[in-house]
Every structure is written in structure tokens, then in C-alpha cells.
Amino acid sequence: GFEISLGLTGVLALWLGIMKIGEKGGVIQAFARLTAPVFSKLFPGIPKDHPATGSIFMCISANLLGLDNAATPMGLKAMKELQELNTQKDSASDPMIMFLCINASGLTLIPVSIMTYRAQMGAANPADVFLPLMLATFSSTLVAILAVCFKQRINILQRNLLLFFGGMIAFIGGLALLFGMMSQQSVSLYSTLFANILLFSIICGFIISGIRKKINVYDTFIEGAKEGFQTAVTIIPYLIAVLVAIAVFRASGAMDFLIGGIRMGVSAAGLDTQFVEGLPTMLMKPLSGSGARGMMLDAMNTYGADSFIGRLCSIVQGSSDTTFYVVALYFGSVG
């Protein structure tokens, strides 16, 4: 837990420093105004033009590009800003729950990390899981939003929300059609290139906004980086607790026992048990990203990156998030 938190320290310091520049440069507020028509309906508890809206947008955008390292500090910053609005500090507010569910649903348009792993493991077409990943994460995110809206009694028939959902469906469908017409090599090349260019543009844009506002960019970055370091220290106990529980689950043999039972049940029903070999990745993913990643790589190494199991584990790894880890991390950061 301490080693993971230590590894996050540099990333948190970098991105919270960049976010602080963007906040004082007016970029975060601009994002808040841009997303207000939709976010004001999904997050009715957040005041108009509040910085939390911009931070939520930045976190979701980073997740869309598959940039996990960038999304984490942005998400932690959003949670801190939501906690400031929370009237019951020891309980999660409705906006917190909505944000956490959207974040944990794993919406990804460009799975850069998964395609990189598949390329390293010798896949003939590393991007061949692109469309299944996009459709799976879109479905999970849509269900998450609708479920929370139902629970929080948010009217989904509002004009802005209907336009938002319709726009999402049209965009995903158009993107799927576009990439379906391209070769796998082109999909991998252009999606990775787009993600990297956009990431670099965001950093440059934030810095330029700070210069235009005539703020001290260096001091502002250091101020945000200090917040990143403090956040990394704060989450250590929560990470250790969840990682100990995961270690006990694995070391006790409970996971092997569970998988063995499922294999027997599926076999007794006369069904194909091939998918069972992907269950270790499926069961580990909600608990530990690094553990699931290791099992995915082991599956690709054992069965081949282009095998059914290799593709299945890649899709599972890329289309879901480490739910319990995210809960511990995000709620731990706000106490």
C-alpha cells in the first residue's frame, strides 16, 4: 500500500500542480460553464460554475482517453471539492455517488494502455479489442448513470439529458463505424497519436492560460504539487486496508475455490468452459488493477495474445475499473 501510494505521489504532484495552474488561469471554470447544461442536471447539488464541475469533466475526459495516471489526481481533486459542498462530512453526498459510479464504470474511448500491453505480448492486431471495449464501457456507463438517476430521483426525461444520451449514442455509433472502416494498424496508430497529442495540448493550454492571466506559474504549480503530496500521504491507510483484504482473498485459496466451483457447474450444465480461464482477471479487476493486469498478461503469455482467453482478459481489463480500490482511494482522500 505504501509503495503504491509512493508511486502515485509523483503523478499526483504533477497533475494537481497542472490543475492548480488551470484553476487560477480560468480553464477549469471555462470547462464548468461548458458542461453546465448537462452536469447541472446530473449533479443538481453542485452550484453553477463551481470548480468541481470542471474537475469532474477533466477526470472523465482522462478516463475516456485511457489515461489512468492522469485521471486519478483529477478525480481526487474533484472529490475534495465535492466534500467542501457536502453538508454531512461523514457521509457521501449524491454528487459524490454519481461521480464515483460514472468513474467506476470505466468509460474508455481510446484504450491506450490495453493496446500497448497487447502489442508488447505479440498480438498481430493490438487494436482488435477496440470496438468491444468501447461498446462494453459505454453500456456500463449508461447503466450506471440511469441507475443512479433512478435512485436519486433525477428526471432523465429532461431535454438536456435526452440530448446528452442521444448525442452519446450517436457519437459512439459514428466512432465505431469510422474505426470499423479502418485497418487495425491505423486504429492503433491514430487513437494513440490522438490521445498523446490531446494530453500534451492540455498541459500546454493550462500553462498558457496561466501566463495570459499573469500569474506566477511556477509558484502555482508548486502549490498544487504540495496538495498532491499531502493527498498521497492521506490515502496510505485506506490503501493498506483494501490491499490486505485482497491479499487474504488470494492467499486463502478462496478465489481458486470459487473458480473451481464455477468450472464444475458450467461443465455439469454441458456448456463451454473456455471462458472460465478468464475468471481470475474478472474477479481480481474490481479489487486490484495491478493484480488483474498481472493475470491478464499471464493469460496472454499462456494462451497467446490473439487467443479467445487473451482477448477476453484484455476486454475485461480495459472495460471495467478497480471499484473497491477507487472507493478506498477517493473516499480515503476526503476522510
Where do the language-model regions lie?
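Interfacial loop-to-helix junctions that mark the boundaries of transmembrane helices
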Residues: 1-3, 126-132, 156-162, 185-198, ...
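Membrane-embedded alpha-helical segments and adjacent helix-loop junctions characteristic
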Residues: 1-84, 213-302
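Hydrophobic mid-bilayer segments of alpha-helices in multi-pass membrane transport proteins
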Residues: 9-14, 163-172, 193-209, 236-244
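Alpha-helical transmembrane segments of integral membrane proteins, especially early/N-terminal helices
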Residues: 21-32, 94-97, 159-168, 199-202, ...
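Transmembrane helix-loop junctions in multi-pass membrane proteins
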Residues: 23-28, 109-125, 150-152, 176-190, ...
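Short hydrophobic/aromatic segments of transmembrane alpha-helices and their interfaces
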Residues: 53, 90-93, 200-201, 275-276, ...
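Membrane-core helix-loop-helix motifs of multi-pass transport proteins
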Residues: 82-172, 306-317, 323-335
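A cytosolic-side transmembrane-helix exit/cap motif
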Residues: 148-150, 179-187, 240-243, 275-280
